[in-house]
Amino acid sequence: MVLIRVLANLLILQLSYAQKSSELVIGGDECNINEHRFLAIVHTDISLCTGTLINQEWVLTAAHCDRGDILVLLGVHRLKDVQTRVAKEKFICPNRKKDNEKDKDIMLIRLDSPVNNSTHIAPLSLPSNPPSVGSVCRIMGWGAITSPNVTFPGVPHCADINIFDYEVCRAAKPELPATSRTLCAGILEGGKGSCDGDSGGPLICNGEIQGIVSWGGDICAQPREPGHYTKVFDYTDWIQSIIAGNTDVTCPP
């Protein structure tokens, strides 16, 4: 009954989001059922986000997805092999700017009990090195696949995008700071990209989570307007310290 209620709420949230903006993976195809074993639905009563399982007890997502009590669903693809967990603890950078959702947009969720690896559930590795400019990386999510007349596929969709130099994102938005702990990624001609409905989801390069979907333009997947992804490599020490029990650690400035 809990799962049915959550899935009904997810549909309502998706329809609500679709009326406000294009919150979706644009230009993708249905993910292979075996390629998103780490993908999580991060659900609250008022929001829908995505997350990434990084070990049996921890999920990585975006800090701006912290909007109340969180329920995490894993193994979701046509409702096969689903495991449901409640967020036991949530960790956000203590030095994050409270008035800026884009600042240090990363959150660790500790589950109330470990998940079991299965055919459709397994963690994704943290990055060993940062991605290179020009790398082809993978995004995925459950959002609509068309816009503005939305169509919901009912399964996660995936798309390949490119890592750009940060200056490409600054060219689209000159007000951005000179440096950033984010990755700039997308397709220069537009047509593929993630958006708000995929917030917290992974940017995957060479089998590792390199980015977390953070923010983008008001209209998604527009030409010369790449998306912004929290650069996970810069936060690996913080992540590993939290998991090890050092909850007083701060994030890099």
UniProtKB/Swiss-Prot annotation:
The keyword Transmembrane helix does not apply. Its EC number is 3.4.21.-. The keyword Glycoprotein applies. PROSITE patterns: TRYPSIN_DOM (PS50240), TRYPSIN_HIS (PS00134), TRYPSIN_SER (PS00135). Expressed by the venom gland. Belongs to the peptidase S1 family. Snake venom subfamily. This is Snake venom serine proteinase 14. Residues 25-244 form the Peptidase S1 domain. It holds the Pfam family Trypsin. Residues 1-18 form the signal peptide. Monomer. It comes from Crotalus adamanteus. Residues 19-24 form a propeptide. Disulfide bonds join C31-C158, C49-C65, C93-C251, C137-C205, C169-C184, C195-C220. GO terms for biological process: proteolysis. Glycans are attached at N116, N117, N149. One of its GO terms (molecular function) is serine-type endopeptidase activity. The active site is at H64 (charge relay system), D105 (charge relay system), S199 (charge relay system). InterPro entries: Peptidase_S1_PA, Peptidase_S1_PA_chymotrypsin, Peptidase_S1A, Trypsin_dom, TRYPSIN_HIS, TRYPSIN_SER. GO terms for cellular component: extracellular region; secretory granule. It is found in: Secreted. Keywords: Disulfide bond, Glycoprotein, Hemostasis impairing toxin, Hydrolase, Protease, Secreted, Serine protease, Signal, Toxin, Zymogen. It comes from the Eukaryota.
